[in-house]
A protein has these predicted regions:
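Extracytoplasmic "Venus flytrap"
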Residues: 34-62, 69-79, 98-101
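Periplasmic-binding protein-like
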Residues: 37-38, 91-99, 116-120
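Short, well-structured alpha-helical segments in soluble
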Residues: 76-91
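Flexible loop/hinge segments that line or gate small-molecule binding clefts
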Residues: 110-136
Length: 146
């Protein structure tokens, strides 16, 4: 009977170590993402504050697997240098949260096909040139009608 208990304990230990090893390998393979945000305002403007809340939620959910770089109070028409700054910092994704940023962001996206760019509320993703790394998005826009 002692032999059965010993064999059972050894099997449990081996399985535990194997499980831990698989978990460690899986965690090491997870990609660390760097996301850049450009906002037209700051936390005192409701429009920008909603994006800040979304960014904070993403940081909370993904923890140390995501790094966020944020630039506030960028006027439309002055976004190009800030986009370049985020590219130079090595951002994998860049979210420029103002409708007026659209044309400038698309021009930069054309130069950097390995970086994903998104302009919430934008409308030019499907106009020429259509780029695989440039996106527009809307939230649940119907809610504004009520």
């Amino acid at each position: 009977m002692k032999r059965v208990y010993t064999l059972c304990i050894i099997t449990c230990l081996v399985m535990s170590l194997f499980s831990f090893g698989i978990h460690k390998i899986t965690r090491e393979d997870e990609k660390h993402l760097k996301v850049g945000f450009i906002f037209v305002g700051d936390e005192i403007t409701p429009y920008t504050n909603n994006f800040i809340k979304a960014r904070d939620h993403v940081k909370e959910v993904y923890g140390d697997r995501i790094e966020c770089v944020t630039i506030y109070n960028v006027a439309e028409g002055q976004v190009e240098s800030h986009l370049q700054e985020l590219v130079d910092e090595g951002c994998d994704y860049i979210i420029a949260a103002s409708y007026g940023y659209g044309p400038d962001v698309k021009a930069i996206a054309e130069q950097y096909p390995d970086i994903q760019f998104c302009v919430p509320t934008g409308d030019n993703a499907n106009s020429d040139p259509v780029l695989p790394n440039y996106h527009n998005c809307f939230g649940e826009i119907y809610q504004g009608r009520y």
